[in-house]
Amino acid sequence: KYFTTDITPTTTPYEAGLGFCVDLNKGDFIGRDALVKQKADGVTRKLCTLVLTDTDEFVQIYGGEAVHHEGKVVTRIRSGGYGFTVKKNILYAYLPVDLAVKGTRFTIELIEGNLAAEVTANVLYDPKSEKLKA
């Protein structure tokens, strides 16, 4: 997750999956009231990890590509790149919470044409950190 592409001043830590970094009891700070409300009400969108499912070959992702669901643009890609270890194109996008479910399928509008993608686990390699702790 990158600041200025995936995380910006228009997103919140809760939307980005970084709520564990927020200490609402630390005292007053700019945006605290909004975060308290969002934590209580829940988020309307979440930063999700998607992978292209049509190809395992490298595809250039620039950010800003339209994400379609059932023929309708629902959001745009924030960033993407190729995961050489998992041999997949990995994309980040803020999805409406009802679509932010593992396995939900989308069509990504690329310069080369449309490709299928789906929501996947946020951590694709060593999700339990077993290799890191070995």
Residue ranges of each PLM-predicted region?
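Conserved, structured C-terminal
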Residues: 1-134
